[in-house]
Amino acid sequence: MNRNILLDVAESLEKEKLIAETKEKDVMIRHYLITENDKKTIHEEAGDYFVFSFDDMVLYEEKESLKKVLKKTLKTFLKKYHKGGTILFIGLGSKNILGDSFGPKVLNNLIATNAYNDFLILPKVALFTPDTTNKTGISSYKLIEMVVNHLKPDLIILVDSFTTTHFKNLNRTLEVNDCGICFANQLRSNKEITRKTFNIPLLSIGYPTMFKMHKTYLNHFRLEKDLNIMSEVVASAFNELLFD
């Protein structure tokens, strides 16, 4: 788990930071623009943040609608940042810890094409799951750095489990930003991965799976079901945008 979802600190943001707030197919979409000055007070990277909020009905009965809404935002980001080179998806976290498994679960449903040199019309997609430092003995940052230096992608997409201090956001929000992630967990490096780290455009996808109360982390009793649905929604959205 890494940073909290931006919505946790939204109330402390100035009103003009909320660029747009719309509702589509029962999904609330909030677009925030964070500046370098804001970073000093809320400790979030500067950039564009899109937060999707939804209820049980959307997640369980209308996931196709949720995917369509998500695809619109992802399409905008891909059009802006993907210039035809390799896209490197990085699934942060551990598949063995349910509350930290969103990244690996999403990547498990994505299509990897980077090795298919004969199919020139296919977008080049590479997948990498570094696992946690206590499993590998190597910091996640160092592993990612080696892969980035080898592949030289033109876009990095990080996928990770987030935390939240507001129970209403647990399992019912999704964040997409073009800023990055700071490894706040003690099991990982304290280094951050942002678009400045490797001088490569970067997207970050975060799903809050753990509720932080004081120094305790709790998860929802339906977490496994919700994780399976959301990981499929996110992966399917990317697969359709890249390969359909």
Enumerate the predicted regions with their spans.
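Gly/Ser/Thr-rich loops at beta-strand to alpha-helix junctions
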Residues: 92-101, 134, 161-165
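Short glycine-rich or small-residue beta-strand-to-loop segments that form or flank ligand, phosphate
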Residues: 53-55, 86-97, 127-131
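Active-site rim loops that border cofactor/substrate pockets in soluble metabolic enzymes
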Residues: 119-148, 172
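C-terminal functional extensions of proteins
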Residues: 201-244
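Glycine-rich phosphate-binding loop
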Residues: 141-190
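A glycine- and small-aliphatic-rich helix-loop capping segment at beta-alpha/alpha-beta transitions
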Residues: 73, 98-115, 173-182
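N-terminal amphipathic/basic leader segments beginning at the initiator methionine
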Residues: 1-47
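An N-terminal, well-structured beta->alpha segment
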Residues: 38-80
